[in-house]
Design a protein with these regions (language model features):
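Accessory helical-bundle/CTD segments and flexible terminal tails appended to RecA-like ATPase motors
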Residues: 1-189
Length: 189
């Protein structure tokens, strides 16, 4: 049974996401998980949306937004890409950007990055408070980017990569490759 307040929340975010959030909260209370799952925010200066000219029906559009938001790996990405091409024809760049950003979020969660924020000069990756593998990650960054990376070792560590040498159309691929490389190297002993 749900009260009107809970039903309103469920309607706003969708049944599947609501159930997952509820399940995670119960596990956290029972002590089955140590901390709340990280929710990564991505602030990248890029058009990332589903144009009405691509999907006109608002209900279908919301369903596609939910599917894109649920991307957790490359298999999910490929599955959604194929579904969109089958149902709606070729995918506009803004939708590809949206899918890429969702995939970037999934990679960032693995590294416990809670925020990715871009400005005109750099992109900043902020780790969750108390992140433990910071030395491994920073070692990789220094070996590859030397003068183009700034590292901060405080309680909430972050790194910033200067982006003035990266072309705008290559940015999302740069983020994906950087995060995949950091994940791979952080798993090495």
């Amino acid at each position: 049974m749900m009260g009107s307040s809970q039903h309103g929340h469920m309607a706003a975010i969708g049944y599947d996401l609501y159930c997952r959030m509820l399940e995670d909260t119960v596990k956290l209370i029972k002590g089955e998980i140590e901390q709340e799952p990280i929710e990564t925010t991505v602030d990248i200066k890029m058009d990332a949306y589903i144009p009405s000219s691509y999907i006109e029906d608002e209900i279908q559009k919301i369903e596609v937004y939910k599917k894109i938001a649920a991307i957790e790996n490359m298999d999910d990405y490929t599955e959604i890409k194929e579904e969109l091409e089958d149902r709606y024809s070729s995918i506009p760049e803004a939708v590809y950007n949206l899918m890429d950003i969702a995939y970037i979020k999934s990679l960032a969660k693995i590294l416990l990055i809670e925020e990715i924020k871009e400005n005109q000069k750099e992109i900043r990756f902020k780790f969750q408070k108390g992140f433990k593998n910071v030395n491994k990650v920073y070692r990789v960054l220094l070996s590859k980017y030397k003068d183009n990376v700034v590292l901060y070792f405080g309680e909430t560590p972050f790194f910033a990569v200067r982006i003035n040498t990266i072309k705008r159309e290559e940015m999302l691929n740069f983020y994906k490759e950087l995060l995949k490389e950091l994940i791979e190297n952080s798993r090495k002993k």
